[in-house]
A protein has these predicted regions:
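Aromatic-lined, polymer-binding surfaces characteristic
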Residues: 31-43, 47, 52-282, 288
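CBM-like, beta-strand-rich accessory domains located in the C-terminal region of large
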Residues: 24-25, 332, 424-762
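Carbohydrate-active enzyme catalytic cores, enriched for enzymes
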Residues: 172-175, 199, 247-418, 593-594, ...
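Active-site rim elements
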Residues: 239-245, 266-270, 394-397, 428-432, ...
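Bacterial Sec-dependent N-terminal signal peptides
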Residues: 1-26
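Aromatic/acidic polysaccharide-binding cleft in carbohydrate-active enzymes
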Residues: 297-309, 417-442
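Active-site-proximal structural scaffolding
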Residues: 121, 125, 185, 248-251, ...
Length: 762
């Protein structure tokens, strides 16, 4: 206790000493972002590399075009060129702009000022503060003392005081992290902080403001959300932010720019302890899709697939948080592929793009990742370009996070072959009437309805969740629970994503409070063509087959009246994301009214558009179970769905007998060679089971129900297990394995009478 108290006292003394030193320290301009070190590196680059020389010429051309104007918009270009060349023409223009803008009455918009209480600072004010800081920092050495003071006072009044006053500092603060703690908060606070850093030689209140930003910024990263207004935790434990890639990157970028400026102004200073920073790089990598051409990124929510996060990664790299996958990611981004990027021909990209020569060919990351805190998951078969990737979302709904619980996007051979409809400019009625709503996503509707429209503004009190991600190579699985957001209609809205070899099975477990009509929505990212009971979606070299299997097949022909019990389809016209036209999405309707449905749809990933041979899928049923037998290229998989394991039983366990297998598992699959004995499977998948038996033999036993994948050969047994922190389970193998891997880690082989015992506590 005494030791801890001593440490606290010493720490407080050091902080006081540092703050006293920083108050006395004069900032040597320019030192915010375009530092002398960055300038020297850039000059060397353009001498050695023609690509960088061309980028420099484009920056200079933009600055030259601004010499005949008097606007702040491109002050960063004027500043960069002045610092690179020393040409006083650019300084004169910066000086003219700065002396002009400080006479403005206010930077806030009339719409923001009309709010109650008035919002004196928004993103526009933040952007002007940033550009003003860059301009003042660059021009500072050439300005007279009187000009410095005049400009500093004006910029403090216009930028620092409203930004930090509204968003951070007492007694004028009107915002909290609970009400506006998303990307706006970091932009307003951190751009106000950067401007304050630039003004502190002239104004001690600016110095204090910058220190306040430095002190409170870690709280934004650590915000845990709340219950009363259903605000999401900002950052997932595995990295990343729930708002969508677009706004996650923007909010993070603004925070990191402040930290970079701070460490430049105060050399030798250290970053606060922010654990979330170390996971950002892997988050951005996991939600991207490398392809031939522009790098795609998951566009859940208010993002676009062209938007990338190279800016945040460059800033992390500049701060010394360096991981090889950062370089890999930055190298994938094409110049100019989105609006706000750090590209070579823009000042921040010009100064902060790291040397990419050491970038790996592929990142050293797992093929699958679950972001459980905000309900995203990605699964891919490779990190190579144009591979296959499935992205799943079931999490929060509010603001930039759409009404898309249990939705997904499928990327295959370079395209989003099953896509998200996207978004548009927010004031457009199509945004709130279509793009935000369930109808714009690949979900199940009941009586034509998905999530309530009010969730856009008020959020969903009950959110969606993702659980039990498993990746066993050719077998991958994740469970989505979207019941909460649609609980006005549904008591069960579960969607299982089971990816086995070249087929992804969507298994929907649906229960509603009353009888009604179910429909499945599909947003194709290519040409939709029905052939019999299958639908083929084709885009360039990519093709997938969508094959509904349960509760009914798709009606075989357009004469749907001849197939009164089968699924019929509806073509629905909707706006394209750019609002320049319309596109068609599809609804597959189940005739009749039901209150409980099991839906199974197979999505077959074709190796080529012309591939003729496809997996043969035989529908099979028994007492209390439904299933499939899938045969393809000498391999057979028997897939079983336990009808008793869907919550209909209270205290009785859900035991079934299926083809000689006895189990309480919700879902299980066994794979074996064609013509061989199913009792000797090469691969086993079990979802939510405590036992799998055949005859008198136990194949799997656990007191608690688990999810697992089992694969092995004569020497090795691989197990991937989820479902409980404490596992004490047995798995059957033919012989004692030499090696045992559990969840990718080596484990001790504990073998007896044909069973391997696995015990751990996580």
């Amino acid at each position: 206790m005494r030791s801890n108290m001593l440490k606290i006292i010493v720490g407080l003394i050091l902080i006081v000493c540092w703050m006293s030193t920083s108050r006395a320290q004069q900032v040597k301009h320019p030192s915010l972002l375009y530092t002398s070190e960055r300038i020297s590196q850039a000059k060397l680059r353009i001498q050695q590399d023609s690509v960088w020389a061309r980028a420099w010429e484009e920056i200079k051309q933009t600055a030259d075009e601004e010499l005949g104007k008097k606007r702040l918009d491109k002050a960063d270009y004027l500043s960069a060129v002045f610092l690179m060349t020393g040409d006083k023409r650019y300084f004169d223009k910066l000086r003219e702009i700065l002396l002009h803008i400080v006479h403005s009455k206010a930077w806030a918009s009339s719409e923001m000022l009309a709010r109650n209480p008035a919002w004196r600072a928004d993103l526009n004010v933040a952007h002007k503060a940033y550009l003003s800081a860059i301009a003042f920092d660059a021009a500072y050495p050439e300005l007279s003392a009187g000009e410095r003071k005049q400009i500093a006072k004006g910029l403090y009044r216009l930028g620092v005081e409203p930004l930090l006053g509204d968003w951070l500092c007492e007694p004028t603060r009107i915002h909290s992290l609970n009400s506006m703690g998303h990307n706006w908060w970091t932009s307003c606070v951190c751009m106000g902080g950067i401007l304050a850093l630039s003004l502190q030689n002239e104004l001690d209140e600016a110095r204090k403001g910058a220190q306040t930003v430095y002190e409170y910024l870690p709280e934004w990263f650590s915000f845990a959300g709340d219950e009363l207004q259903q605000k999401a935790k900002s950052f997932d434990e595995a990295g990343g932010m729930y708002e969508s890639l677009n706004y996650a990157n923007f909010g993070i970028q603004e925070a990191l720019q402040f930290f970079v400026a701070w460490t430049n102004v105060y050399p030798g200073s250290t970053l606060p302890d922010i654990p979330q920073l170390k996971h950002l790089s892997s988050f951005f990598a996991h939600v991207c899709y490398p392809r031939t051409g522009i790098l795609y990124n998951i566009n859940f929510g208010d993002s676009h697939k062209n938007v990338a996060a190279e800016s945040s990664l460059m800033l992390l790299y500049a701060l010394g948080i360096r991981q090889p996958d950062m370089l890999w990611y930055i190298r994938q981004v094409e110049q100019g592929q989105h609006r706000d990027g750090y590209f070579r021909n823009r000042p921040m990209g010009f100064f902060y793009t790291p040397d990419l020569k050491g970038a790996p060919d592929v990142p050293a990351l797992a093929h699958s990742q679950l972001f459980a805190d905000f309900g995203w998951a990605t699964m891919r078969n490779s990190w190579q370009k144009d591979a296959s990737m499935l992205a799943v979302k079931s999490g929060h709904t509010w603001n930039h996070s759409h009404a898309d619980a249990n939705s997904f996007i499928l990327y295959h051979k370079g395209v989003d072959i099953i896509k998200d409809a996207g978004n548009c400019w927010y004031p457009n009625p199509q945004y709130r009437n279509y793009f935000f709503q369930s109808q714009a996503h690949n979900v199940v509707l009941f009586n034509g309805e998905g999530q309530k429209r009010e969730q856009q503004y008020h959020g969903s009190t009950l959110r969606g969740y993702l659980y039990n991600l498993l990746d066993g190579g050719n077998i991958k699985y994740v469970l989505a629970n979207g019941t909460g957001p649609v609980s006005d209609h549904f008591s069960r809205n579960f969607r299982h994503f089971l990816w086995m070899d070249n087929v992804i099975y969507l298994i929907d477990d649906l229960k509603t409070h009353e009888y009604g009509e179910f429909e499945w929505l599909w947003h194709p990212g290519g040409e939709w063509k029905k052939r019999g009971a299958d639908v083929t979606i084709t885009n360039g070299e990519a093709a997938v087959v969508v094959r509904p299997l349960y509760p009914r097949l798709l009606a075989l022909s357009d004469f749907v009246h001849d197939y009164p019990n089968d699924l019929y389809w509806e073509e629905i016209s909707a706006p394209t994301e750019d609002l320049k036209g319309t596109e068609t999405y599809y609804s597959l309707h189940l005739p009749g009214k039901f209150d409980r449905v099991k839906g199974v749809t197979a999505i077959i990933l074709k190796d080529s558009v012309g591939q003729k041979e496809l997996p043969v899928m035989e529908k099979r049923e028994g007492k209390d179970w439904i299933g499939l037998r899938i045969t393809f290229q000498g391999k057979v998989t028997d897939l079983y769905i336990n009808q008793l394991a869907d919550g209909r039983l209270m205290h009785s366990n859900s035991w079934i007998e299926a083809d000689g297998w006895n189990t309480d598992a919700y879902l299980f699959a066994v794979t074996y060679d064609e013509g061989e004995d199913p009792a000797k499977p090469k691969e086993v998948f079990v979802a939510y089971g405590s036992a799998l038996r055949r005859n008198s033999d136990s194949y799997f036993s656990s007191l608690s129900k688990l999810f697992y994948i089992q694969k092995g050969d004569a020497k090795k047994l691989d197990l991937w297990i989820s479902g409980q922190p404490l596992v004490n389970a047995y798995f059957r193998t033919g012989k004692r394995p030499v090696f045992l891997n559990v969840n990718g880690e080596k484990a001790t082989v504990n073998y007896k009478e044909g069973l391997v015992k696995v015990k751990y506590n996580h």
